[in-house]
Amino acid sequence: KGLFSDWVPKPVQLLMMVLLLIVVMPLGGVYVGNISFMVGGTGVIQEYFVWANYATTIGMGACMPVVMRMKMRFKVRDKVVVLLLLLGMLSYVNSTTAIPMVIVMTSLVIGFMKMMITIELFLPLMVMLGGRGIFYGVFYTFVLILNQVSAYYAVQVSIEYNFQQFFVLASVLCFALALLCWVFMHDKYFALKVPLHYIDWLSILLFVSTFMFSAYVLSFGKQQDWLNSKNIINASIAAFVSFALLAIRQMTLKRPYISFNIFTKSNVLNGLFMLLCLGMFLGTTSLQNIFSVGVLGYDQLTNAKLNLMMSPGILLAGIVAVFWFKKERPLKMFIFSGFAAMTAYAVIMYFSMVLEFNYENWYLPMFLKGFGMG
């Protein structure tokens, strides 16, 4: 069964799914372009908001192993409407609080909940687009461009008003979508109703604690001088103990939360290695920000525009991906072209970091970075 009632026209169904993607996918506890405004507005050090940014991703990861069981446990309309209302309330909380730990915790919960809505859109869109390969080419291209656009407007709204207004806007959009979903979605189950008691909540807690403590170390390490800080040492020990307990528990469960057997497959190991390499290339964003803001003197809005320059490259990568998967060609050359584009971006920027660097000179390296990311 799909998401919407039988009387809803197909174009309206597609429009609703696009609106859900536009609102839910960029949603987070913090927005990267907003961090400097949040630091100035709350008087809290930047590291808390970096930690909150990690927390959103950790929440999404924690939801992944149980997301299908959640999908089949509740009626479609009830689940999506309640989740949108909760996301709207959490966004409003972030707009009104100046307590950093509240923002960190809401970011974690927002990540968990937005993943539950996202999975509702995966299967209908995959069927509509006709194949997994084409779906990934279209879907991830759309999401990557959407993230760049939302980051830009987050900065623009923060400059014209304040950083709280973007959270209020996100909250209002969630409430409006909840009303539309209540009208257009059906109140039936996706498939056979399944119980939740097979979900191991302790494993989820251990998973979250492992990565939240690790994210704390990565976020606050430099600020607290790494191993010279008791907090960093204690967080590192807590992350290690949590991971050890998580691994031991998975070995004793009949239905483990995470199966470590997947890490014995060569495809998974190769994929993890490529993700690590991609992460290293994407890590150059921090160097790029230091150069653009600290050396060239760009303001936050101009700096956000640089990320918009990646959109044509991302779009081209998505178009190539669709044709590549449609022709069922081997992925080696496609992946190689992406890493080659990333390498070219890094080389160009290495030789271009001078005070005479013009704004127009950003177009080529950012296009290559976008293509590599896509």
How should these model regions be labeled?
Residues 43-50, 137, 229-235, 300-308:
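Small-residue hotspots at the loop-to-helix junctions and early N-terminal turns
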Residues 31, 59-64, 117, 146-151, ...:
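Discrete transmembrane alpha-helix packing/kink hotspots characteristic
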Residues 11-27, 31-36, 53, 68, ...:
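12-transmembrane solute porter fold
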Residues 56-58, 144-146, 311-313:
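Short hydrophobic/small-residue motifs within alpha-helical transmembrane segments
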Residues 43, 75, 93-101, 297, ...:
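Helix-breaking motifs and short loop linkers at transmembrane-helix boundaries and internal kinks
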Residues 34-63:
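Extracellular/periplasmic helix-loop-helix junction of adjacent transmembrane segments
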Residues 160-273:
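Hydrophobic transmembrane-helix bundles of small-molecule transporters
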Residues 64-201:
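Helix-loop-helix hairpins in multi-pass membrane proteins, especially solute transporters
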